[in-house]
Amino acid sequence: MANIYYDEDASLDYLKDKTVAIIGYGSQGHAHALNLRDSGIKVIIGLLAGSRSIEKAKAEGFEVYSPDEAAKKADVIMILTPDTVQPALYQSAILPNLDEGNALAFAHGFNIHFGQIVPPSYVDVFLVAPKGPGHLVRWMYEEGKGVPGLFAVYQDFTGKAREIAMAYAKGIGATRAGLIETTFKEETETDLFGEQAVLCGGATALIKAGFETLIEAGYQPEVAYFECLHELKLIVDLIYQYGISGMRYSISDTARYGDVTRGKRVYEAVKPLYKKILEEIQEGEFAKEWILENVANRPHFNALVKKDEEHPVEKVGKELRKMMPWLGGRGL
């Protein structure tokens, strides 16, 4: 079982008299910065020239610097830019400004685990990853609560990297809910697997396969959309709040019987595929593919996204969502 830590297990003293630079001011960066500051920690922001977030960060009372200036001024540098941006940003702006005993921090382990960022031996390296979007991390903090999180230490130069990581997690509110200790390897590989096999790739593939099956059998696209996509939220919300067994308690006996008998067939079909997907992640095959795709300016990726955007489920959904006033007409 996992080791889980709470407020009493962590001390903010390890960040006392230190400056934390948050590189990036998006969803997570915004939440981390505000929560850390409200926890009494000195925070500065590092943003590239021309960033749309500069004025927002300044309006919220932060000193804003270029990433290299922020890294130079900070003791702890948390990099919260997209994974694909981090390696070049690190090489140009952060690495040249790292001092002995600094701490380099991440919210996802991809670039460290797959060797896209190789930190010098004279710094601490840790990870703190709240298991929720930035707005929730901030909202829960303001309510005196927190969002559970993960933390890991990759490199402990000072002998205090673990304590500093836990202090950071406490500063953003994670220890109020529960902080789970992990490794960069575990966080990275499980995060990628969840995205590919279940949360994004798996869910969207099931939706499209179900939708297409009904259409090909002669059913109306609108009805297929409701049954295979729209109602998914109802079930996921129940699972999210009550777990799988709790969800089953809330559905009809007919639905429950179909779940436990027919769902097993899907399980048996996808389990071997899941093992293959995980193997590709563990062996670095996916990381290599994604890195090379970005080097080539994403031709395959862009083509696949465009193709999926033209899927009939998108056209049908766009029209049906106009019938749902509770969505407020919001689009992307």
Swiss-Prot record:
InterPro entries: 6-PGluconate_DH-like_C_sf, KARI, KARI_C, KARI_N, KARI_prok, NAD(P)-bd_dom_sf. Pfam families: KARI_C (PF01450), KARI_N (PF07991). It comes from the Bacteria. Pathway: Amino-acid biosynthesis; L-isoleucine biosynthesis; L-isoleucine from 2-oxobutanoate: step 2/4; Amino-acid biosynthesis; L-valine biosynthesis; L-valine from pyruvate: step 2/4. Involved in the biosynthesis of branched-chain amino acids (BCAA). Catalyzes an alkyl-migration followed by a ketol-acid reduction of (S)-2-acetolactate (S2AL) to yield (R)-2,3-dihydroxy-isovalerate. In the isomerase reaction, S2AL is rearranged via a Mg-dependent methyl migration to produce 3-hydroxy-3-methyl-2-ketobutyrate (HMKB). In the reductase reaction, this 2-ketoacid undergoes a metal-dependent reduction by NADPH to yield (R)-2,3-dihydroxy-isovalerate. Binds 2 magnesium ions per subunit. Belongs to the ketol-acid reductoisomerase family. NADP(+) binds at residues 25-28, 51, 53, 83-86, 134. Mg(2+) 2 binds at residues 191, 227, 231. The active site is at 108. NCBIfam families: ilvC, PRK05479.1, PRK13403.1. One of its GO terms (cellular component) is cytosol. The gene is ilvC. SUPFAM superfamilies: 6-phosphogluconate dehydrogenase C-terminal domain-like, NAD(P)-binding Rossmann-fold domains. Coiled coil: none annotated. This is Ketol-acid reductoisomerase (NADP(+)). One of its GO terms (biological process) is L-valine biosynthetic process. The keyword Metal-binding applies. Keywords: Amino-acid biosynthesis, Branched-chain amino acid biosynthesis, Magnesium, Metal-binding, NADP, Oxidoreductase. GO terms for molecular function: ketol-acid reductoisomerase activity; magnesium ion binding; NADP binding. It comes from Sulfurihydrogenibium sp. (strain YO3AOP1). PROSITE patterns: KARI_C, KARI_N. Residues 183-327 form the KARI C-terminal knotted domain. Substrate binds at residue 252. It catalyses: (2R)-2,3-dihydroxy-3-methylbutanoate + NADP(+) = (2S)-2-acetolactate + NADPH + H(+); (2R,3R)-2,3-dihydroxy-3-methylpentanoate + NADP(+) = (S)-2-ethyl-2-hydroxy-3-oxobutanoate + NADPH + H(+).
